[in-house]
């Protein structure tokens, strides 16, 4: 039961042509647009596909799985096997991919990254989805941005594990003091949050035992293994 996470900046150079053409999804074959936002989204897809391809090789799973990516009814990309799952997130110029291999059952993962481009009205946003106790906790925190994106990213990661949109943010109950999360929109597992990367990161894994996670970053033309410092760990849907 091993999990792999890779991230990279879309402005870096990637040998995208090295991906066999038969492993490209239809969205990557679409003609280029003159619209800059569309171009950036297209670049994010390419980088995400490249990182997923790399992680499949690292995990020793067949890269031919890329040919069979399909979409759930909610639009979540998925593989046609139960023991391998992946999820993708991008924000600003950053892309992150999570891949989990579980030889003992189903793999379910979700990931969210946020690279803030501007300061927001955090209390007003929290009022839409956080409980009064969580909002009270937030007012006592010194690092407002970090605290807000902890509350936001963990919800997104949990919901993305099932392909559920942010309309259900308020359906995720977050106890920052006990470090527990409850939601009917995901199975039991663990969530990890970090603020030590060039972006905020949260990911969910449907595993209650000790996690085995390997982190990689694309830099200078190689996918280099790295470490995650000062991570915060949560129990998700823990039985009492």
UniProtKB/Swiss-Prot annotation:
Gene Ontology annotations for the cellular component aspect, listed alphabetically: cytosol
Required cofactor names: Mg(2+)
One Pfam family in the UniProt entry: ACPS
Top-rank taxon: Bacteria
Transmembrane regions listed in the UniProt entry: none
Gene Ontology MF, one: holo-[acyl-carrier-protein] synthase activity
Binding site for Mg(2+): 112, 114, 156
Protein's GO biological process: lysine biosynthetic process via aminoadipic acid
Function: May transfer the 4'-phosphopantetheine moiety from coenzyme A (CoA) to a serine residue of a carrier protein domain.
Protein name: Putative 4'-phosphopantetheinyl transferase PM0116
Species name: Pasteurella multocida (strain Pm70)
Lineage: Bacteria, Pseudomonadati, Pseudomonadota, Gammaproteobacteria, Pasteurellales
């Amino acid at each position: 039961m091993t999990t792999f996470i890779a991230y990279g900046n879309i402005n870096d150079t990637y040998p995208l042509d090295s991906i066999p053409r038969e492993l490209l999804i239809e969205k990557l074959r679409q003609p280029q647009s003159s619209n800059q936002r569309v171009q950036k989204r297209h670049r994010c897809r390419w980088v995400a596909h490249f990182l997923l391809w790399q992680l499949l090789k690292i995990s020793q799973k067949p890269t031919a799985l890329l040919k069979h990516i399909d979409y759930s009814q909610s639009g979540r990309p998925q593989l046609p096997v139960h023991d391998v799952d992946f999820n993708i997130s991008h924000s600003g110029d950053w892309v992150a991919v999570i891949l989990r291999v579980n030889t003992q059952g189903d793999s379910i993962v979700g990931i969210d990254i946020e690279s803030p481009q501007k300061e927001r009205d955090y209390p007003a946003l929290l009022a839409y989805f956080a409980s009064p106790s969580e909002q009270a906790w937030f007012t006592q925190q010194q690092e407002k941005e970090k605290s807000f994106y902890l509350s936001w990213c963990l919800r997104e990661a949990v919901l993305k594990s099932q392909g559920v949109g942010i309309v259900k943010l308020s359906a995720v109950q977050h106890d920052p003091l006990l470090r527990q999360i409850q939601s009917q929109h995901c199975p039991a597992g663990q969530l990890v949050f970090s603020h030590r990367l060039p972006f905020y990161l949260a990911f969910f894994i449907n595993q209650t035992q000790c996690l085995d996670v390997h982190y990689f970053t694309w830099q200078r033309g190689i996918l280099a293994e790295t470490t995650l410092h000062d991570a915060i760990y949560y129990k998700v849907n823990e039985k009492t």
